[in-house]
A protein has these predicted regions:
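N-terminal winged-helix
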Residues: 39-56
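Short histidine/acidic/glycine/proline-rich micro-motifs that form metal-
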Residues: 41-43, 71-72, 97-101, 163-167
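Conserved ATP-dependent adenylate/AMP-binding module captured primarily in the ANL superfamily
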Residues: 75-79
Length: 306
């Protein structure tokens, strides 16, 4: 383009307050400066912390972020992936919606991801994808929680957990069984309470547990939303007290710290998860031919009431 033509175009653009379309720019460049992030629930504070960790890294590299939620639903997950492909994201940080491996459709998902033609880092849930992976060892973490409670003399340890199809539920339940076995505590299915990973489900399942004749002395809740529902139900029953059972929750709850209420938890640092995943993605962008990495993050038990 001749210089005077270019100057005229720029002048007209300024007069009209024209902003170039990022989508059109991506299409012309066949790539973008945008990193896609797909998580189960954007509103969950755990994933808000994860986003902060991701942004810490992407800002350093002048990359913008495009978020989407999959609601732990396969169809919604596919739509989110299609949208990311259409936007030609430069890389993708991804938490699979469901256990595609157990459902027999892992190959279909892998082909879909391969067609995106960008680096992908799988976060939080290891379902066997061929890509970089970073997650916590939830199985080991729940096993440690059971043993910590057993060391305090508890023999009736209940668990409030998500549905059987969820890969995290599978791993956490295995940790629960391993902990019981190592502590010499017989497994009792009456102490297993299943729901979905939501606050409402945690509340409903806890109400069911409280109403049972066979009562636990300790309870493990398997994510922050289940823990919030559990606390709500217990506080209703005890008129504001949280110590009806000895309790360990998976993930921190900021609210407890702000209220000054002691809270036992398995600390899964969501910020570190996002930070580490973004670092892996940047490394993959810089070294695309390197062997895939599998990173397992530590999740210590933080206890304040025993």
């Amino acid at each position: 383009v001749e210089e005077h033509t270019r100057e005229n175009i720029i002048r007209i653009m300024k007069e009209l307050h024209y902003t170039p379309s990022q989508t059109a720019r991506n299409l012309s460049m066949k790539s973008s400066s945008t990193v896609g992030v797909i998580v189960p629930e954007i509103s969950n504070t755990f994933f808000g912390e994860l986003f902060s960790g991701v942004e810490e890294i992407t800002k350093r590299h002048n990359l913008s972020l495009l978020y989407s939620g999959n609601d732990n639903d396969m169809d919604t997950d596919y739509k989110a992936l299609d949208m990311m492909k259409m936007q030609r994201v430069r890389g993708l940080l991804y938490i699979p919606a469901v256990n595609y491996s157990a459902l027999g459709v892992l190959d279909k998902l892998q082909r879909k991801l391969d067609r995106m033609n960008c680096p992908i880092v799988c976060m939080d849930r290891d379902i066997g994808l061929k890509c970089d992976i970073v997650h916590f060892d939830d199985q080991s973490a729940v096993r440690k929680a059971v043993l910590a409670l057993a060391n305090e003399g508890h023999r009736k340890i209940a668990i409030i957990i998500g549905d059987k199809e969820n890969i995290l539920s599978v791993q956490r339940f295995e940790g629960y069984l391993e902990g019981l076995k190592k502590a010499g505590i017989p497994y009792d299915e009456d102490l297993v309470f299943r729901g979905t990973y939501t606050r409402v489900s945690g509340y409903q399942v806890t109400k069911q547990m409280i109403a049972k004749s066979k009562q636990p002395t300790a309870v493990i809740t398997c994510n922050n939303l289940l823990s919030k529902g559990y606390i709500q139900a217990v506080c209703e029953h005890t008129h504001g007290k949280t110590d009806m059972y000895t309790h360990i929750g998976l993930d921190e709850i900021d609210m407890m710290q702000y209220l000054g209420i002691p809270y036992n938890c398995i600390q899964r640092d969501a910020y570190e998860l996002g930070h580490s995943a973004a670092e892996l993605l940047i490394k993959r962008l810089e070294q695309p031919d390197e062997t895939f990495q599998h990173m397992i993050l530590n999740s210590p038990l933080v206890h304040q009431t025993f």
